[in-house]
């Protein structure tokens, strides 16, 4: 979990070239559409909605451990005493769960990581670039505390 919080891979869009779906499909293949209990152990995941009864909030990052019926999710959660603990949950208990090998830049707002990699699907001087794209790129760059890798289509 600590390594997950130290590294972010960001995409500007959910769909399209170099998008969140593109990255997940390339790395996970058909497993992305399967039951989360079939996802590989070690896969980063993100909670897609608030579940206060479990101590989870929309955007909380976790990781899969185990496989099949033994599959579980680990999430960092705040304890009643204000400390941070680790919660181990069965995947069926999470209403909205997605792989999180990469995140959209929008989803990563408010997050920071030591190392950030940004996948950018067009040249920075592209005529298709707009003010919205520049703001998105700025947001992505400012997520990095120590290092930034910017991968751009030539």
Segments (PLM) and residue ranges:
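Conserved helicase/translocase motor-coupling segment
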Residues: 1-63
């Amino acid at each position: 979990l600590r390594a997950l919080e130290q590294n972010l891979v960001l995409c500007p869009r959910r769909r399209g070239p170099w998008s969140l779906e593109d990255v997940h499909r390339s790395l996970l293949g058909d497993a992305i559409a399967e039951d989360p209990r079939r996802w590989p152990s070690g896969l980063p995941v993100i909670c897609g909605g608030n579940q206060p009864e479990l101590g989870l909030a929309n955007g909380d990052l976790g990781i899969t451990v185990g496989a099949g019926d033994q599959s579980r999710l680990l999430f960092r959660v705040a304890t009643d005493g204000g400390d941070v603990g680790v919660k181990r949950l069965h995947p069926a208990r999470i209403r909205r769960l997605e792989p999180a090998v990469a995140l959209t830049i929008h989803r990563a707002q408010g997050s920071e990581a030591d190392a950030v990699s940004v996948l950018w699907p067009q040249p920075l001087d592209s005529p298709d670039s707009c003010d919205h794209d520049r703001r998105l790129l700025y947001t992505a760059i400012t997520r990095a505390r120590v290092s930034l890798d910017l991968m751009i289509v030539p």
